[in-house]
C-alpha cells in the first residue's frame, strides 16, 4: 500500500493534537458517563434540546420524539428509532451498512495493512489484539470503517445473518476518533479501547469492532449487556459455541450493540468473500440498513 505525502499540520492543529495526548482521557470519559446518567428533569431536557439543535439531531425518526420523553442524556443518546425508519436491504446476497455515520475509510486490506486515513496505515495484528490466527483470516480481504458523529443514531446492527464465535475486550487509550484525529494520531484504532466481535457467516468469518473514544462512557452488546465500565486492565477473551442454549444467532439488520456517545465501527471481510459498493468513498454518509456490498457465494 503506497501512501501519498501530505502537508504538515499547522501550529493550531499541532496544539489540538498535543491536547489529545495530554488530557486526562479516562477521567473525562468517566465524568461524561456519570453526567450522562443523571436524571435532572428539566435540566436534562434543556441539555438534550441544546444538543439536538446544535448537532441537528432528527428526533422525528425516534420512537420518543420530544426531549422531555427522556429521563437521562444516555437514554436520549441510544434512542431507538421508529419501526421501518431504516429499511433493511432484503436481497439475500446484499450486505447492509451497520451504522449511521460517515465512511472513514474502506477498501482492500493490503496483506495485513489497513488504511486509517490519509498518510496513516495500521496492521491487522495490532487491531486484533495480536490474535495471529484471527488476523490471518482477513489478510488481503476488505474492510470498512464507519465514524459515528454526535448527531448520529448510536446503535450498531448486523450487516448479515451471523453466529457469534468470539468476543475480545481490549483495554486501551481513549483518543477522539473524529476524522481530524484519524489523520494525525498514528495507529489510532489499534491503540484505543475496543471490542472485537468475530462472527461465522455464510461466506466465512466476519469481524465487527466497536472502537471506544474520549467520552464514550460505555459500549454494550445485546448478548452481554454493558461491557465497560468497569474497565479491565487486561485483554479478555470470550468464546461462544455455535449451537446450544448459549449460542448467539443474529439476523441481518438486527441490533448487536451500542455506544454511549459516539465512536467508530470497523468491519473486516475475508479475501474474495465480498465486493464493496463502488459508490462508497471516504466521507460518504451512511444509513444503517442500506447496501454495503455483495456477498460472493
Swiss-Prot record:
Cellular component per GO, a single term: plasma membrane
Lipid biosynthesis recorded as keyword: yes
EC class: lyase
Pathway it works in: Phospholipid metabolism; phosphatidylethanolamine biosynthesis; phosphatidylethanolamine from CDP-diacylglycerol: step 2/2
Residue numbers carrying Pyruvic acid (Ser): 263
Keywords of the record: Cell membrane, Decarboxylase, Lipid biosynthesis, Lipid metabolism, Lyase, Membrane, Phospholipid biosynthesis, Phospholipid metabolism, Pyruvate, Zymogen
EC number, as in UniProt: 4.1.1.65
Catalytic activity reported: a 1,2-diacyl-sn-glycero-3-phospho-L-serine + H(+) = a 1,2-diacyl-sn-glycero-3-phosphoethanolamine + CO2
Domain of life, source organism: Bacteria
Site note Cleavage (non-hydrolytic), residues: 262-263
Cofactor annotation remark: Binds 1 pyruvoyl group covalently per subunit.
Active site location: 100, 157, 263
InterPro entries: PS_Dcarbxylase, PSD-B, PSD_type1_pro
Family under the similarity heading: Belongs to the phosphatidylserine decarboxylase family. PSD-B subfamily. Prokaryotic type I sub-subfamily.
Record protein name field: Phosphatidylserine decarboxylase proenzyme
Amino acid at each position: 500500500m503506497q501512501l501519498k505525502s501530505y502537508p504538515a499540520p499547522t501550529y493550531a492543529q499541532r496544539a489540538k493534537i498535543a491536547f489529545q495526548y495530554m488530557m486526562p482521557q479516562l477521567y473525562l470519559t468517566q465524568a461524561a458517563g456519570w453526567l450522562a446518567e443523571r436524571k435532572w428533569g428539566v435540566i436534562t431536557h434543556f441539555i438534550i434540546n441544546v444538543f439536538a439543535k446544535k448537532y441537528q439531531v432528527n428526533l422525528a425518526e425516534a420512537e420518543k420524539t420530544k426531549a422531555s420523553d427522556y429521563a437521562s442524556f444516555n437514554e436520549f443518546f441510544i434512542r431507538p428509532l421508529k419501526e421501518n425508519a431504516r429499511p433493511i436491504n432484503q436481497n439475500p446476497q446484499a450486505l447492509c451498512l451497520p451504522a449511521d455515520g460517515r465512511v472513514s475509510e474502506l477498501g482492500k486490506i493490503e496483506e495485513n495493512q489497513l488504511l486509517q486515513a490519509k498518510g496513516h496505515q495500521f496492521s491487522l495484528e495490532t487491531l486484533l489484539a495480536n490474535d495471529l490466527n484471527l488476523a490471518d483470516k482477513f489478510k488481503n480481504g476488505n474492510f470498512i470503517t464507519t465514524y459515528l458523529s454526535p448527531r448520529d443514531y448510536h446503535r450498531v446492527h448486523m450487516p448479515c445473518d451471523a453466529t457469534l464465535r468470539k468476543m475480545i475486550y481490549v483495554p486501551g487509550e481513549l483518543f477522539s476518533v473524529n476524522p481530524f484525529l484519524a489523520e494525525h494520531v498514528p495507529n489510532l484504532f489499534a491503540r484505543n479501547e475496543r471490542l472485537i466481535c468475530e462472527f461465522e457467516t455464510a461466506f466465512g468469518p466476519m469481524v465487527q469492532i466497536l472502537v471506544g473514544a474520549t467520552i464514550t462512557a460505555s459500549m454494550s452488546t445485546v448478548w452481554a449487556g454493558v461491557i465497560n465500565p468497569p474497565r479491565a486492565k487486561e485483554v479478555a477473551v470470550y468464546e461462544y459455541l455455535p449451537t446450544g442454549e448459549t449460542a448467539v444467532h443474529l439476523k441481518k439488520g438486527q441490533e448487536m450493540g451500542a455506544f454511549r456517545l459516539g465512536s467508530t465501527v470497523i468491519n473486516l471481510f475475508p479475501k474474495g468473500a465480498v465486493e464493496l459498493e463502488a459508490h462508497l468513498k471516504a466521507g460518504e454518509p451512511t444509513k444503517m440498513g442500506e447496501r454495503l456490498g455483495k456477498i460472493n457465494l
